[in-house]
Amino acid sequence: MDNSRRDFLRKVSMATAGMAIFTGLPSFNVIANTAKKPFFKISLAEWSLHRTLQSGAMTNMDFPSKAKNDFGINAVEYVDQYFKDKARDLNYLKELKSRTQDLDVRNVLIMVDTAGSLATTNDAERSKSIENHYQWIEAAKFLGCHSIRVNLRGIGTPEELASSSVDSLGRLSEYGQKNGIGVIVENHGGVSSNGKWLVDIMKQVNNPFCGTLPDFDNWCVSLQTTGTGKECENMYDKYLGTKEMMPYARGVSAKSRTFDAAGSEVNIDFMRLIKIVKAEKTRAFQGFIGIEYAGNVLSEDDGIRATKKLLERVAMNM
């Protein structure tokens, strides 16, 4: 083979290899987009607007459009008390579902606060409470939610409340499983804000449709009365509690109250918590972190915007 032909073949081979290398690489834009894509989507908890709702300035039916049009959020988390007599009102639910479909807004979950205690040691009361929750599982299914959020509150020792809670969650989760709806517990004061206690409940129930909803700031296990009112005397560590709850979490509630001049939450390290969420989440996690502004310094609208901006900033810097 002469030298000219040998050189030609060598150059063709090098060019082909180079093309193969570069063809296999994503473009710069793809790399940039992949690096910046957050692992979670933002939803809005209706409680963020509780003062507006309670004043009558808006209704539950208005909530999805406000989330989308005022805040650019296309996923919502309802609170049952703002449509508490509508769980089995098919016409109402059809209208709500139609509006969210027209808006391209996702119905994520329903927070249930008015259906009774699931941790009460009174068997008759507990059975009634369980039955009251069934309608919300059905409503959640109709709306396309992934879960209902429930509470574990009651009077008794931690052991007594645990026994009642396991019974309630076991029965509710079976019903939820039949309907494809999760039953998730929030740390919402009292013994439910003890992460270790709540995780033990999850282990005993042992149903994939029974899970948790870690809230960034609901960690007061017990209160004490002082001269100026009530103060928390036993505060569970929010970072430990979130880490403990995340393996069972189907969602996360990003509670916020007060912001500094830089836009960070004064008492809650969002970056640290969201790193925990990312590290400890499992396949149970449905992908949403819900804004729940509960402060009094900013207006509800401004508090929601500040929390959204903070979540977006954290996501971009992870």
PLM feature spans:
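N-terminal pre-domain/capping segments
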Residues: 2-142, 160-163, 177, 196, ...
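Active-site clefts of carbohydrate-active enzymes
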Residues: 254-262, 286-298
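Hydrophobic residues in well-ordered beta-strands that form the structural core
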Residues: 44, 107-109, 149, 185, ...
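Hydrophobic residues within beta-strands of alpha/beta enzymes
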Residues: 76, 108-110, 148, 252, ...
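A short helix->loop->beta-strand "cap" motif at the edges of active sites that frequently abuts
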Residues: 105, 181, 280-287
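Acidic/histidine-rich catalytic cores of soluble enzymes
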Residues: 75-76, 170-276
